């Protein structure tokens, strides 16, 4: 590069930049910029011709103004004129301006291309370098059309200087990546391969990158590069060789070239025996050097050394043909598992995941199981813990399955929310794949539902039902186990589904025990009925009609339930239809017909586990899971089949996601088209600029919203296409909500746009901030969005989340209420009995108290009531109320503008099945809203 003369300092540019930096306000900056733009315009339009220095200075000022964020609509022609200058600095500024400001549709593109062609033909290495840099920086299709045929000629020309060859190789690589169809293969390809023997480090490094990319699409054209790459790698890593010794980086010879050569060799299978022997020597040398004491304590030395080592291990794993090398690589990675560097531990775990899939190294990987389990328990970085989970999954077999599953279940209780669903899938797969004793499998899945029920997908509980139905030896144990599990005060809904299905099929196997008589089984299931969603209630109704067949002694009790107004006049059409049909069936059908219609489910056909298919979709192609399944086929006795998809009685209805015992219909899908737009309400669009019509609230949205008043995590909405999950945390007046959008199909969602909608008054009381999500959601994938929440003042309404996307060419439009309620900003406050009643008396003004007497909607269980009050956000004060049956709580609602003390008292009346709820706060609107929210929970 030519030296820059003193006159090229451009003092005027320095003064202008200094003036901009000294501006005290944005207005002052804009004023100074406008003044300068006017000056530059006058200079460009003046009668006096500008010299090259002045043009360069003014073009630099325009470029600086553009980088400040201001539009530039003139000066382009002056920049193009600079391209024809013979002074390096002027030409450099011209190319810089062109690279940054000129787009491919510009009218000046022909002039620019002519200037670039002139520089490429000039044989001046400096000018050629500038032109190549410009082509690569712009990288447009138009550039590829104009120069893709010229650059290979420059690259392989014998008289081209090394610096230009390097630039040409990288420029061609850039054009090939953007427009591969415009880069023709030809005679130059064989000559490019021989650049691997070039003595200039920059040339051979750039050529290696180019050849690696080209070889992935054109392997036959570049297969001769294998022997040259092995030869060059051997000369670099062998101590006796002097090849590229001048390019030693912290005692490691040409590390980045070595990495690129090793990566190139992964494009081809193991070479012929002679070349393979030489490559094996290289890899052994790299592994041997990794065992040597470090020649320097500086981090640059270890980084370079480990970069070569990990790429060598990747090549060993990729070829998967040398048992000795695979075992040595595993042992080397095992040493890194306890290294103090977090990045090294992460990379070691990642590489060992792939090693575990090789039949040669699987046993060697298993020897490190205790270290990996320890990493799962002690690592601070969640990404390292994630890799530890992946490695445990990959190294699992029959010999260690129970230990690994137990450790995963233990970790699941504290795992990061973003990876819980994946861990659940892996535990379910391992428990099924390596189950010798299927009682252990049943225990594991039920424990899985207990620990992480919100993350147990339908595929998991479908699968346990399939396996229980297919295996006679476990049916009685499964019925007994789910019966015992359902006796817990609070059961997850997925456990109710599994319990309802299994007891409906095999409850007769435990009915002989007085502790699990038919009536007790029915009462136990029915006690959960009112706490469940519509699909689960539909399943339980099917279980009840199964009980009519299995246990005639409870027929009258079940008919009374089916005959009740809550069933026959249910607002949900599906539940109403089932109740009517089942009641009629139990009344008119003979015993033989009833037994035929309600006979036990037949075994499911043997197919691939739907859980494994879901995990493959979630992880994407070419993952450890795929490698394990394709490269390490072990003999596994797995029973199972497809998930039990219920049939619908109506051709127009969509199958319910719940397992349907009789296939008598399904829950209608969510609306799939945009309704007429409605006026009123301010759209605070924090996700997108879309202004499409917003759908009305999805069916069940209010029920799901109410379920989140006393909890922060779970599934907010689910239909056949989309699942929306939430995880939220709140502290004082601030909160953060993680929204997970899951694509349940195998087809991409396009134009995926979530929008947050707030009413006028809500916008002033609640501040919500977030960022857009990716508009494309792959099939089986999940995207996450974070919403930051600030409570400015108390509020009554909740935001609405509207999701619009295209699925299979059909427009989908879903709206749900986002469970951001006033009680989320509750901070519990512990108080003694005396303090509580003293404060209670202070809040005795009529406008400060709100009281509600209401009928119990759910079973009046003491433990559940306590859990709901605590989940509501209040502190539960023990031994404060003189009546031990009453519940009292205290807390403070935090907003940005004020703090509001809150006291509550809940008085249950078991005989009348009623409650009296009293709220006293220092603000009447807060008392009213909290009373409304909490009353809906009991």
Swiss-Prot record:
Organism: Mus musculus (Mouse)
GO cellular component labels: AP-2 adaptor complex; cytoplasmic side of plasma membrane; cytoplasmic vesicle; membrane coat; postsynapse; presynapse; secretory granule
Gene name tied to this protein: Ap2a2
Organism ancestry: Eukaryota, Metazoa, Chordata, Craniata, Vertebrata
Subcellular location: Cell membrane; Membrane, Coated pit
Annotated effect of mutating residue 837 to A: Reduces SNAP91, AMPH and BIN1 binding. Abolishes AMPH and SNAP91 binding. Abolishes EPN1 and EPS15 binding
Variant or mutagenesis effect after changing residue 45 to Q: Reduces phosphatidylinositol binding
Gene Ontology annotations of biological process type: clathrin-dependent endocytosis; intracellular protein transport; postsynaptic neurotransmitter receptor internalization; regulation of hematopoietic stem cell differentiation; synaptic vesicle endocytosis; vesicle-mediated transport
Residues reported in the UniProt entry to bind a 1,2-diacyl-sn-glycero-3-phospho-(1D-myo-inositol-3,4,5-trisphosphate): 11-12, 43, 53, 57-61
SUPFAM superfamilies named among the record's database cross-references: ARM repeat, Clathrin adaptor appendage domain, Subdomain of clathrin and coatomer appendage domain
Stated name of the protein: AP-2 complex subunit alpha-2
């Amino acid at each position: 590069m030519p030296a820059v003369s003193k006159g090229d300092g451009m003092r005027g540019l320095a003064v202008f930049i200094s003036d901009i930096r000294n501006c005290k306000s944005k207005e002052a900056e804009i004023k100074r910029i406008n003044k300068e733009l006017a000056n530059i315009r006058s200079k460009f339009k003046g009668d006096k011709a500008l010299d090259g220095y002045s043009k360069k200075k003014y073009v630099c000022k325009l470029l600086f103004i553009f980088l400040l964020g201001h539009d530039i609509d003139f000066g382009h022609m002056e920049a193009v004129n600079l391209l024809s200058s013979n002074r390096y600095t002027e030409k450099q500024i011209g190319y810089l301006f062109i690279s940054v400001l000129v787009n491919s549709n510009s009218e000046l593109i022909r002039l620019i291309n002519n200037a670039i062609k002139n520089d490429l033909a000039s044989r001046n290495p400096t000018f050629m370098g500038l032109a190549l840099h410009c082509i690569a920086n712009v990288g447009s299709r138009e550039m590829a059309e104009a120069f893709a045929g010229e650059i290979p000629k420059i690259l392989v020309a014998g008289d081209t200087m090394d610096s230009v060859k390097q630039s040409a190789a990288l420029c061609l690589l850039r054009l090939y990546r953007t427009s591969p169809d415009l880069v023709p293969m030809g005679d130059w390809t064989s000559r490019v391969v021989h650049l691997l023997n070039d003595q200039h480090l920059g040339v051979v490094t750039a050529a290696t990158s180019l050849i690696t990319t080209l070889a992935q699409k054109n392997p036959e054209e570049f297969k001769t590069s294998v022997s040259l790459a092995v030869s060059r790698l051997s000369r670099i890593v062998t101590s006796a060789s002097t090849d590229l010794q001048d390019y030693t980086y912290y005692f490691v010879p040409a590390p980045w070239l070595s990495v690129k050569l090793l990566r190139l060799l992964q494009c081809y299978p193991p070479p012929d025996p002679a070349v393979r022997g030489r490559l094996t020597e290289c890899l052994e040398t790299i592994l041997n050097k990794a065992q040597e004491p470090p020649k320097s304590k500086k981090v640059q030395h270890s980084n370079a050394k480990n970069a070569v080592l990990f790429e060598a291990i990747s090549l060993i794993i990729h070829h998967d043909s040398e048992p000795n090398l695979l075992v040595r690589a595993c042992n080397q990675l095992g040493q890194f598992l306890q290294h103090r560097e977090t990045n090294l531990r992460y990379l070691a775990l990642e590489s060992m995941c792939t090693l575990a899939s090789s039949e040669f190294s699987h046993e060697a990987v298993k020897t490190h199981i205790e270290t990996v389990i320890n990493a799962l328990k002690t690592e601070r970085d969640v990404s390292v813990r994630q890799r530890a989970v992946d490695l445990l999954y990959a190294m699992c077999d029959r010999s260690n399955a129970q230990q690994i599953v137990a450790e995963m279940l233990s970790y699941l209780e504290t795992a990061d929310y973003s990876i819980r669903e994946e861990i659940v899938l892996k535990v379910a797969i391992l428990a099924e794949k390596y189950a010798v004793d299927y009682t252990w499998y049943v225990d594991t899945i039920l424990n899985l539902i207990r620990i992480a029920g919100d993350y147990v997908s339908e595929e998991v509980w479908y699968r346990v039902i399939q396996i229980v139905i297919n295996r006679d030896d476990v049916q009685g144990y499964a019925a007994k186990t789910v019966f015992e599990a359902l006796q817990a005060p609070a059961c997850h809904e997925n456990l109710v589904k599994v319990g309802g299905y299994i007891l409906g099929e095999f409850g007769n196997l435990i009915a002989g025990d007085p502790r699990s008589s038919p009536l007790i089984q029915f009462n136990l299931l029915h006690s959960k009925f009112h706490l469940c969603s519509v699909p689960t209630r539909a399943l339980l109704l099917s279980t009840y009609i199964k009980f009519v067949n299995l246990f005639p002694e409870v027929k009258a009790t079940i008919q009374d339930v089916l005959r009740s107004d809550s069933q026959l006049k249910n607002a949900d059409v599906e539940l109403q239809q089932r109740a009517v049909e089942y009641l009629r069936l139990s009344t008119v059908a003979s015993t033989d017909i009833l037994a035929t219609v309600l006979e036990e489910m037949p075994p499911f056909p043997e197919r691939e586990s739907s859980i494994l298919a879901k995990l493959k979709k979630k992880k994407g192609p070419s993952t450890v899971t795929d490698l394990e399944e394709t490269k390490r086929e072990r003999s596994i006795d797995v029973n199972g089949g497809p998930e039990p998809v219920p049939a619908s009685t109506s051709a127009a209805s969509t199958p319910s996601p719940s397992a349907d015992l009789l296939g008598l219909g399904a829950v209608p899908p969510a609306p799939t088209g945009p309704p007429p737009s409605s006026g009123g309400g301010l759209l605070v669009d924090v996700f997108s600029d879309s202004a499409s019509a917003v759908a009305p609230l999805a069916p069940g949205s209010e029920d799901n919203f109410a379920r989140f008043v006393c909890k922060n995590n779970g599934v907010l909405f689910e239909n056949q296409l989309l699942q929306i999950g939430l995880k939220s945390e709140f502290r004082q007046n601030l909160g953060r909500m993680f929204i997970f959008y899951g694509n349940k199909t195998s087809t991409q969602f396009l134009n995926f746009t979530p929008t947050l909608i707030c009413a006028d008054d809500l916008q002033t009381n609640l501040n919500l901030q977030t960022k857009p999500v990716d508009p494309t959601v792959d099939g089986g994938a999940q995207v996450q969005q974070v919403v930051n929440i600030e409570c400015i003042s108390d509020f009554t309404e909740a935001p609405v989340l509207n999701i619009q996307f295209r699925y299979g060419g059909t427009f989908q439009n879903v709206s749900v209420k986002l469970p951001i309620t006033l009680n989320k900003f509750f901070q519990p406050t512990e108080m003694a009995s005396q303090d509580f009643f003293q404060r209670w008396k202070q809040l005795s003004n009529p406008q400060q108290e709100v009281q509600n007497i209401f009928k119990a909607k759910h079973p009046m269980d003491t433990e559940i009531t306590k859990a709901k009050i605590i989940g509501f956000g209040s502190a539960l004060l023990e031994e404060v109320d003189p009546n031990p049956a009453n519940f009292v709580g205290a807390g403070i609602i935090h907003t940005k503008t004020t703090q509001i003390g809150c006291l509550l008292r809940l008085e249950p009346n078991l005989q009348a099945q009623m409650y009296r709820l009293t709220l006293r706060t220092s603000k009447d609107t807060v008392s009213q809203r909290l009373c409304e929210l909490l009353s809906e929970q009991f």
